[in-house]
Regions:
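Bacterial Sec-dependent N-terminal signal peptides
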Residues: 1-21
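Metal-associated gating/positioning segment near the N- to mid-region
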Residues: 82-90
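M16 family metallopeptidases and their MPP-like homologs
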Residues: 46, 51-68, 75-76, 93-142, ...
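Flexible helix-coil linker/hinge segments at domain or subdomain boundaries
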Residues: 150, 249-253, 372-380, 631
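Peptidyl-prolyl cis-trans isomerase
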Residues: 98, 146-149, 154, 437, ...
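Hydrophobic, small-residue-rich alpha-helical packing segments that form membrane-like cores
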Residues: 145, 153, 158-166, 170-209, ...
């Protein structure tokens, strides 16, 4: 007994020491130059040469629609538009004209977005043009403080904004969103400040209102400049100081309030229907207090949560593949939200409206199974392997990372205070900490995030299915049910290798170099031609494809649909003696992605891998070609699901679908090989 007490004491002490070691800040990327001007504007500068002669710029404004007054609803978004309609250095439309003449395109190189809490302007600029390089920083400065907000231009823009709102209003997804968001925001200020605003205000607001919003919230202490690209860092810093230092902070500026979404008791249920929604879904949102990631202990918790998300997603994916599964697709995940919250989200697509209750029961059962019995050791080990693959890829490709991929880390640091690490830290930290994350730690996350408090359950579907779908009372009953007969997961593991016998291969009968394009062409004795081309686009990636002439054009009309669907069915059946689920488990921790296809004139396969996993990828390619696994249950399940999806798609017709189908019918004279598939085609 004394020894047991000593062991427990030793364990407790070691745990405290371990926690203390990680209770230190997460280190930011030391290559990033971070500074703050005297007026309060913060800036982030990182030299990165991928792509060469290009720079990513962002102006981040810590202000969005949530800060609007009652009479300003929609003006944060309106102001974003107005910044392209006249500034001090670029009157009226000269800004867009200047950038387009410089070879930049609106949307790809030049854009902006307004959300509830922030507004972000973006530019992608060539750095090999001295004039454009300097002008880019002037553009950001103009957006931040020198918008002209001319009354005539405001009146012109009203129609554009109203048309944008009208177009969204005619879109089913937008209509659903406008009903869904106030529910998720629980009648907080967020629910009353959707960025699109109110039509009557957009039509008639006086110019002084938008000027006031601009002066109140576009101010130095609420703005940051982000610059990442192929440039001289000192030159960029000098340009930021030159263009932004003259901006003055307003006197008596309003306080930037951080709003929160209040909690609600228990589970709330809703039914949101629309005439143009083709497929009904079940969605559930568990709202949880925001967890900030500031220390290395927090970062370790983030990794455990990443593993949790991987495992729970795989559970649902595997469940959807089972014979007679009540849902076609399902996802669950834990992630940041807004208003001081994180969210545990569930989305499920049942086979049809009649099967909605069964789909919900299956999802609730799976959540309860995980809470009751936890994950398995095998699930955790595979998730760790997959996580490490991603970290290793980032580490090996760190000098090939695109500038755009760095930007969001700096934006989130400014807005949320989250750290921006580099690939070296992420790799070293994972090597030290990943293996030590236990099943108990991950299972504790399950109990933390899967709760019935402050939860919203929704059925989003077609008005035509109203009578077939559970009403709000029935949905609440389904969500509260606890199945007493649940059992722990029985894993379907891979017991055999991809290939039980490795083929002998064949000889190379000819070799030819094509120096103009850097390709070596090999011809094998069996007639297969292989073209090899070394590249330096990536450090740790091999991309491959193979094709032959043929495709569905070789098949008779009677066999056309079988040929068209063949590759999809093959991809779901597995290879050799491995089911698709077993194959996924066998490939855990490996980068060996292979797809097959049957086109109109060709068929083939392709994918990507790494030098380390090339052997596995080649075996998988060979297995798909020579040993595709036919599983009658998989075929039956796939065809049934496909038929249901097609039936749902024609049951609820949207204007876009009707237009597209009509164009196809006219262009191709209603030929079944070129027009959208119908439910009855699956029976052929």
């Amino acid at each position: 007994m004394k020894k047991i007490i000593q062991l427990i004491t030793l364990f407790a002490i070691s745990t405290q020491i371990f926690a203390q070691k990680l209770n230190i800040p997460i280190p930011n990327n030391p290559a990033v130059k971070v500074g703050t001007l005297k007026n309060g504007i913060k800036y982030y500068i990182l030299k990165n040469t991928e792509p060469k002669n290009r720079m990513e710029l962002r102006l981040v404004v810590n202000a969005g629609s949530v800060l609007e007054t009652e009479s300003q609803q929609g003006l944060a978004h309106f102001l974003e538009h107005m910044n392209f309609n006249g500034t001090k250095e670029f009157p009226k439309n000269e800004l867009v004209n200047f950038l387009q003449k410089s070879g930049m395109k609106f949307g790809a190189d030049l854009n902006a977005s307004t959300s509830f809490d922030e507004t972000i302007y973006q530019l992608q600029v060539p750095t090999d043009s001295a004039k454009l390089f300097e002008r880019a920083f002037q553009i950001l400065a103009d957006w931040s403080n020198y918008a002209t907000l001319d009354t005539a231009e405001i009146n012109k823009e009203r129609g554009i904004i109203l048309e944008e709102e009208r177009a969204r209003g005619k879109n089913a997804q937008s209509r659903i969103q406008q009903k869904l968001l106030p529910i998720l925001f629980n009648n907080s200020i967020y629910s009353k400040r959707l960025p699109i605003g109110k039509t009557d205000i957009i039509k008639s607001f006086p110019a002084e209102e938008i000027v006031k919003f601009y002066k109140d919230w576009y101010r130095p202490d609420l703005m940051a400049v982000v610059a990442v690209g192929d440039f001289d860092e000192a030159q960029v810093e000098n340009l930021i100081k030159e263009k932004f230092s003259p901006i003055k902070s307003p006197k008596n500026a309003p306080k930037r309030t951080k709003y929160e979404i209040p909690a609600s008791a228990g589970t709330q249920t809703y039914q949101i229907l629309d005439k143009e929604i083709p497929q009904s879904t079940f969605q559930m949102f568990g709202r949880l207090p925001r967890e900030k990631t500031t220390t290395q202990a927090d970062y370790r918790t983030d990794i455990a949560e990443n593993l949790f998300n991987q495992m729970i997603s795989t559970r649902l994916q595997d469940a959807s593949k089972k014979p007679n599964a009540p849902f076609v697709f399902g996802i669950m995940g834990y992630s940041p939200f807004l208003g001081g919250l994180d969210v545990f989200q569930t989305i499920v697509l049942p086979k049809n409206a009649e099967g909605m209750e069964d789909a919900i029961k299956a999802i609730i059962d799976e959540q309860e199974r995980i809470k009751r019995f936890g994950f398995t050791k095998g699930e955790l080990e595979r998730a760790k392997k997959e996580y490490m693959v991603g970290v290793e890829k980032g580490f090996k490709e760190k000098d090939k990372t695109k500038s755009a991929n760095f930007v969001n880390g700096f934006v989130q640091n400014y807005l949320q205070g989250s750290a921006f690490t580099n690939a070296d830290f992420r790799y070293e930290f994972a090597q030290k900490q990943l293996e030590g994350i236990t099943l108990d730690e991950v299972n504790a996350i399950t109990k933390k995030v899967i709760k019935e408090e402050n939860r919203v359950g929704l059925i989003v579907g077609s008005e035509k299915d109203k009578e077939k779908l559970p009403d709000e009372a029935k949905l609440k009953e389904l969500l509260s049910y606890k199945n007493p007969d649940l059992k722990p997961l029985e894993e379907e593991v891979a017991l055999t290798p991809i290939l039980e016998k490795i083929p002998e291969g064949t000889k190379v009968v000819s070799e030819k170099k094509i120096d103009e394009i850097g390709v070596t062409e090999l011809v094998f004795a069996n007639g297969v031609k292989v073209a090899l081309k070394p590249t330096n686009f990536k450090n740790d990636q091999i991309v491959f494809s193979a094709s032959s002439k043929g495709g569905t054009s070789l098949y008779s009309d009677a066999d056309y649909f079988s040929a068209e669907l063949a590759s999809t069915i093959i991809s779901q059946g597995g290879v050799s003696k491995l089911s698709d689920t077993q194959l996924d488990k066998a490939l855990a921790g490996k980068v060996a992605q292979v797809y097959t296809y049957v086109g109109e004139l060709t068929e083939g396969l392709g994918g990507n891998t790494t030098p380390k996993d090339l052997e596995t990828a080649l075996q998988l390619m060979y297995a798909y070609v020579t040993q595709p696994r036919r599983d009658d249950e998989v075929v039956k399940n796939f065809l049934k699901n496909e038929k249901e999806l097609l039936a749902n798609s024609i049951k609820t017709l949207t204007p876009e679908k009707v237009f597209g189908d009509t164009v196809s019918t006219i262009l191709y004279q209603n030929h079944f090989r070129r027009t959208p598939n119908k439910p009855e085609d699956i029976d052929k």
